[in-house]
Swiss-Prot record:
It comes from the Bacteria. Its EC number is 2.7.7.105. The lineage of its organism: Bacteria, Bacillati, Actinomycetota, Actinomycetes, Geodermatophilales. GO terms for biological process: F420-0 metabolic process. The gene is fbiD. This is Phosphoenolpyruvate guanylyltransferase.
Length: 215
């Protein structure tokens, strides 16, 4: 199935020192220089954004962030940025970003998907053509890595147990052969799982893991 709509993707990014606190300290074998945590968070974000920008279903990526380093990196990759003007947490930031895109088809994407492949996102967005609001559960089945809305409000409900909340709000759960899209990184175990799938070049360069194949 080929995506028909042109999707605007919104990615939220906290300030680097405040993000992914369960990854600090890095596990043995994945440790690095003193700023390794911030560099890892930035690498996860960069690989996620780069994969999204490479999907033919995506017309643009907008990152909502107040972090200067994150903003500079994703801008270099070709994404737009807006500041987190609401400053009230993840879901208001996503709503702000969705409005800022000006698009009718908007997808909220987690910022920690280093194993995401462009073709996985393309396939998921094609599947999302089936309903006004759809979501992709994470690998555990309890969280959400992708939420889509076409011609309707995004109404994000990210956070612990978000899959159940999105389903209760009328969004349709999508499943498919997209392990990289489902593999968000919150813990050292998640990170090892992503490395086993093959991560993008930014994360691979930082941690010495296997980069995912291109093409």
């Amino acid at each position: 199935m080929v995506a028909v709509r042109a999707w605007s993707v919104v990615v939220p990014a906290k300030r680097l020192p405040l993000a992914k606190t369960r990854l600090r300290p890095l596990p043995e074998g994945l440790d690095g220089p003193p700023d390794a945590h911030d560099r890892l968070v930035l690498a996860l974000l960069a690989d996620t954004v780069a994969a999204a920008l490479s999907s033919p279903a995506v017309t643009g990526v907008l990152v909502v962030t107040d972090d200067p380093a994150a903003a500079a990196e994703v801008t270099r990759l070709g994404a737009r940025t807006v500041p987190d003007e609401p400053g009230r947490g993840l879901n208001p930031a996503l709503e702000h970003g969705a409005r800022a895109t000006g698009g009718r088809a908007v997808a909220a994407l987690s910022s920690d998907l280093p194993a995401l492949r462009p073709e996985e996102l393309t396939a998921a967005l094609a599947a999302a053509e089936a309903a006004p609001r759809c979501f992709v559960p994470d690998a555990q089945g309890t969280g959400t890595t992708l939420l889509t809305a076409a011609g309707t409000d995004l109404s994000p409900a990210f956070g612990t147990g978000s899959a159940q909340r999105h389903a209760a709000g009328g969004a349709v759960a999508l499943t498919g052969a997209w392990p990289g899209l489902e593999r968000d990184v919150d813990t050292p175990g998640d990170l090892r799982g992503a490395l086993a799938l093959g991560v993008g070049p930014h994360t691979a360069a930082l941690l010495g893991g296997a980069a995912r194949p291109t093409g």
